[in-house]
Regions:
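Surface-exposed, interaction-prone regions used to assemble/regulate multi-protein complexes
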Residues: 1-135
Length: 135
Protein backbone atom coordinates (compact mmCIF):
# COMPACT_ATOMS: atom_id res chain seq x y z
CA UNK A 1 0.00 0.00 0.00
CA UNK A 2 1.13 3.52 -0.74
CA UNK A 3 1.20 6.19 1.95
CA UNK A 4 -0.86 9.26 1.14
CA UNK A 5 0.90 12.42 2.34
CA UNK A 6 -1.06 15.51 3.28
CA UNK A 7 0.38 17.39 0.29
CA UNK A 8 -1.09 14.75 -2.08
CA UNK A 9 -4.73 14.84 -0.90
CA UNK A 10 -6.03 17.14 -3.66
CA UNK A 11 -4.23 15.21 -6.39
CA UNK A 12 -5.53 11.89 -5.01
CA UNK A 13 -9.13 13.18 -4.84
CA UNK A 14 -8.97 14.13 -8.53
CA UNK A 15 -8.00 10.57 -9.53
CA UNK A 16 -11.39 9.09 -8.61
CA UNK A 17 -15.08 9.96 -8.75
CA UNK A 18 -16.33 9.16 -5.26
CA UNK A 19 -19.88 10.48 -5.78
CA UNK A 20 -22.23 7.49 -5.86
CA UNK A 21 -19.50 5.04 -4.86
CA UNK A 22 -20.14 2.08 -2.59
CA UNK A 23 -18.57 0.85 0.63
CA UNK A 24 -17.96 -2.85 -0.02
CA UNK A 25 -16.09 -3.84 3.14
CA UNK A 26 -15.35 -2.12 6.44
CA UNK A 27 -13.05 -3.53 9.14
CA UNK A 28 -12.06 -1.88 12.40
CA UNK A 29 -9.17 -3.57 14.19
CA UNK A 30 -7.68 -2.93 17.62
CA UNK A 31 -4.30 -4.59 18.01
CA UNK A 32 -2.07 -3.78 20.95
CA UNK A 33 -4.12 -0.68 21.67
CA UNK A 34 -3.68 0.76 18.16
CA UNK A 35 -6.83 1.20 16.09
CA UNK A 36 -6.79 0.52 12.35
CA UNK A 37 -9.64 0.99 9.90
CA UNK A 38 -9.60 -0.81 6.54
CA UNK A 39 -12.28 0.02 3.99
CA UNK A 40 -12.77 -1.23 0.44
CA UNK A 41 -14.66 1.09 -1.89
CA UNK A 42 -16.10 0.63 -5.35
CA UNK A 43 -15.50 3.91 -7.23
CA UNK A 44 -15.00 5.12 -10.77
CA UNK A 45 -11.68 6.53 -11.93
CA UNK A 46 -11.79 10.07 -13.27
CA UNK A 47 -12.75 10.11 -16.95
CA UNK A 48 -10.02 10.78 -19.47
CA UNK A 49 -12.17 10.19 -22.58
CA UNK A 50 -15.39 12.14 -22.88
CA UNK A 51 -17.10 9.36 -24.83
CA UNK A 52 -16.29 6.42 -22.56
CA UNK A 53 -17.18 5.73 -18.95
CA UNK A 54 -14.36 3.81 -17.26
CA UNK A 55 -15.32 0.67 -15.35
CA UNK A 56 -15.42 0.89 -11.55
CA UNK A 57 -12.32 -0.05 -9.56
CA UNK A 58 -11.90 -1.36 -6.03
CA UNK A 59 -9.99 1.09 -3.88
CA UNK A 60 -8.66 0.02 -0.49
CA UNK A 61 -8.00 2.68 2.15
CA UNK A 62 -6.27 1.99 5.46
CA UNK A 63 -6.14 4.44 8.35
CA UNK A 64 -3.72 3.55 11.15
CA UNK A 65 -3.55 5.12 14.58
CA UNK A 66 -7.30 5.74 14.64
CA UNK A 67 -8.14 8.42 17.19
CA UNK A 68 -11.85 8.85 16.51
CA UNK A 69 -14.57 7.45 14.28
CA UNK A 70 -18.32 7.20 13.81
CA UNK A 71 -20.33 4.88 11.59
CA UNK A 72 -24.04 5.32 12.13
CA UNK A 73 -26.71 3.86 9.83
CA UNK A 74 -29.84 5.96 9.50
CA UNK A 75 -33.02 4.06 8.53
CA UNK A 76 -33.86 6.39 5.64
CA UNK A 77 -30.46 6.20 3.91
CA UNK A 78 -29.31 3.42 1.56
CA UNK A 79 -26.81 0.99 3.04
CA UNK A 80 -23.26 1.18 1.74
CA UNK A 81 -23.80 4.02 -0.73
CA UNK A 82 -21.62 7.12 -0.45
CA UNK A 83 -22.94 10.54 -1.39
CA UNK A 84 -19.31 11.70 -1.67
CA UNK A 85 -15.97 11.22 0.06
CA UNK A 86 -13.76 14.00 1.41
CA UNK A 87 -10.28 13.74 2.91
CA UNK A 88 -8.77 16.39 5.17
CA UNK A 89 -5.68 16.83 7.31
CA UNK A 90 -6.07 18.65 10.63
CA UNK A 91 -3.78 18.80 13.68
CA UNK A 92 -1.58 15.95 12.39
CA UNK A 93 -4.50 13.58 11.69
CA UNK A 94 -6.14 12.46 8.45
CA UNK A 95 -9.93 12.61 8.40
CA UNK A 96 -12.12 10.79 5.89
CA UNK A 97 -15.81 11.64 5.55
CA UNK A 98 -17.74 8.90 3.74
CA UNK A 99 -21.05 10.80 3.49
CA UNK A 100 -19.82 14.28 2.63
CA UNK A 101 -22.36 16.87 1.61
CA UNK A 102 -21.85 19.72 -0.79
CA UNK A 103 -20.46 22.97 0.54
CA UNK A 104 -20.95 26.39 -1.04
CA UNK A 105 -18.51 27.20 -3.85
CA UNK A 106 -15.10 28.16 -2.49
CA UNK A 107 -15.76 26.88 1.03
CA UNK A 108 -13.17 24.45 2.37
CA UNK A 109 -14.40 21.73 4.77
CA UNK A 110 -13.23 22.18 8.34
CA UNK A 111 -12.72 19.67 11.13
CA UNK A 112 -16.25 20.35 12.42
CA UNK A 113 -17.65 19.25 9.02
CA UNK A 114 -15.94 15.86 9.34
CA UNK A 115 -17.03 15.32 12.95
CA UNK A 116 -20.65 16.19 12.11
CA UNK A 117 -20.78 13.28 9.66
CA UNK A 118 -22.54 9.96 10.27
CA UNK A 119 -19.60 8.11 8.71
CA UNK A 120 -16.08 9.39 9.37
CA UNK A 121 -12.71 8.30 10.69
CA UNK A 122 -9.69 10.25 11.94
CA UNK A 123 -6.23 8.75 12.34
CA UNK A 124 -2.49 9.22 12.11
CA UNK A 125 -1.56 7.65 8.76
CA UNK A 126 -3.44 6.99 5.54
CA UNK A 127 -2.55 4.33 2.98
CA UNK A 128 -4.25 3.37 -0.29
CA UNK A 129 -4.13 0.89 -3.16
CA UNK A 130 -6.21 -0.17 -6.12
CA UNK A 131 -7.22 -3.81 -5.71
CA UNK A 132 -6.82 -5.89 -8.86
CA UNK A 133 -9.96 -7.49 -10.24
CA UNK A 134 -10.22 -11.24 -9.76
CA UNK A 135 -9.89 -13.14 -13.01
Amino acid sequence: MERLHSSEIVQFARKYRFVGGRIKKLRLLNRRGVGTLEVTLLVRPASRDLGAAPPPVKLKLKVTGVEEFRFQKRPTLPSGKMSDLKIGYFNGLYYINFDAWGLPVGEVPGLHDFRASDAFVGGGDLFWEEVAAKS
